[in-house]
Swiss-Prot record:
Protein keywords: Oxidoreductase
Catalytic activity: L-methionyl-[protein] + [thioredoxin]-disulfide + H2O = L-methionyl-(S)-S-oxide-[protein] + [thioredoxin]-dithiol; [thioredoxin]-disulfide + L-methionine + H2O = L-methionine (S)-S-oxide + [thioredoxin]-dithiol
Gene3D superfamilies: Peptide methionine sulphoxide reductase MsrA
Top enzyme class: oxidoreductase
Protein name listed in UniProt: Peptide methionine sulfoxide reductase MsrA
EC number: 1.8.4.11
Keyword Oxidoreductase appears in the UniProt entry: yes
GO biological process: protein modification process
One GO molecular-function entry: L-methionine:thioredoxin-disulfide S-oxidoreductase activity
Function as written in the Swiss-Prot or TrEMBL entry: Has an important function as a repair enzyme for proteins that have been inactivated by oxidation. Catalyzes the reversible oxidation-reduction of methionine sulfoxide in proteins to methionine.
Entry keyword annotation includes Oxidoreductase: yes
Length: 157
């Protein structure tokens, strides 16, 4: 069995985030869902109505010998706007806020270092939260691999 690690990012709509990361060499699997809230096993409806406190996230299992956590962080920073609180594009709400959830002390340190680098290069305040990972709750099946199922990826990654 290959040694794997997990990364979790909230960067707006989880459909787009999953589409971005699932195509990366070294990423073994992706799953969209929710993290950071107070309700166990929240539904998409509860999250969208702001009733659970969760963030839409992509849960990434990867092989660190092929893709580094810092590479995933770079994709995270370069593919959403970390300066807009509770919003990404047309998607508005707390569930769309920018988050990095870490599992290890090394991930925390790398996330903080990358945050500082991005902040130094920006005239705007970076609002990305860096938090210890909590329970991950998978979203309903119809959300998983959404763009792949629809064969309608309008994204250009």
């Amino acid at each position: 069995m290959t040694n794997t690690e997990t990364a979790v990012f909230g960067m707006g709509c989880f459909w787009s985030a999953e589409e971005l990361f699932r195509k990366i060499k070294g990423v073994i699997s992706t799953e969209v869902g929710f993290m950071g809230g107070t309700v166990k096993n929240p539904t998409y409806g509860q999250v969208c109505r702001g009733k659970s406190g969760h963030i839409e996230v992509v849960n990434i299992t990867y092989n660190p010998k092929i893709v580094k956590y810092t590479d995933l962080l770079n994709l995270f920073w370069n593919n959403h706007d970390p300066t807009t609180p509770n919003r990404q594009g047309w998607d508005v709400g707390e569930q769309y806020s920018s988050h990095i959830f870490y599992f290890t002390e090394e991930q925390r340190l790398l996330a903080e270092k990358s945050f500082e680098k991005i902040q130094k290069s920006s005239d705007l305040r970076i609002v990305t939260a860096i938090k210890k990972a909590s329970d991950f709750f998978p979203a309903e099946e119809y959300h998983q691999k959404y763009f792949m199922k629809k064969n309608n990826s309008i994204l250009n990654f």
